[in-house]
């Protein structure tokens, strides 16, 4: 009887261990599912964050005015149209909305080593000043009388000749003879500075004279 009772109770002791194993496997599966969901959620949040930053960056760049737009505003009501003529006679035009890599002077970096380069600058406004920078301005004359077109011949630091054709009207008081070379402009600035110093010395001398005259009385 005791052996039969012992054999009958033995399966009852095995059953709880199997149930514990099943519960443990279920818990592990739930934890793995939760962890995978958390990783997916973090990945989605990171993608949304990166996409928001990139969208804001594109929006800021779209709102920022371009250099071409600023140049158009400074040029006036009409656009600035530039044409380049090389030695072969071919011409190329560049508009403010184009993708040509030219600056305000219309100099193409690809043709900077050419012997000569002729440029036409069409301005719908008034030419206020003509400045050559390091280039020495040699000549300015009318291409044809009455057509408001002026040709400026300039020589660069590398002894290359450049001719600029300006279409427009010169302001009042500015003619062909009033445009001087950089050397003449430097001399004029020196002369004005010396005249200003002379006037300051005279004013100081007069002030000292009046002060001395007042102290004597």
UniProtKB/Swiss-Prot annotation:
Residues 34-93 form the KID domain. Residues 191-211 are annotated as: Basic motif. One of its GO terms (molecular function) is RNA polymerase II cis-regulatory region sequence-specific DNA binding. Keywords: DNA-binding, Nucleus, Transcription, Transcription regulation. Residues 73-109 are annotated as: Disordered. Residues 89-109 have a biased composition (Low complexity). It is found in: Nucleus. InterPro entries: bZIP, CREB1-like_pKID, Leuzip_CREB. One of its GO terms (cellular component) is transcription regulator complex. It comes from the Eukaryota. This protein binds the cAMP response element (CRE), a sequence present in many viral and cellular promoters. Could regulate the transcriptional activity of genes involved in regeneration processes. Binds DNA as a dimer. Belongs to the bZIP family. In contrast to other proteins of the family, the C-terminus is shorter and lacks the leucine-zipper. This is Cyclic AMP-responsive element-binding protein. It comes from Hydra vulgaris (Hydra).
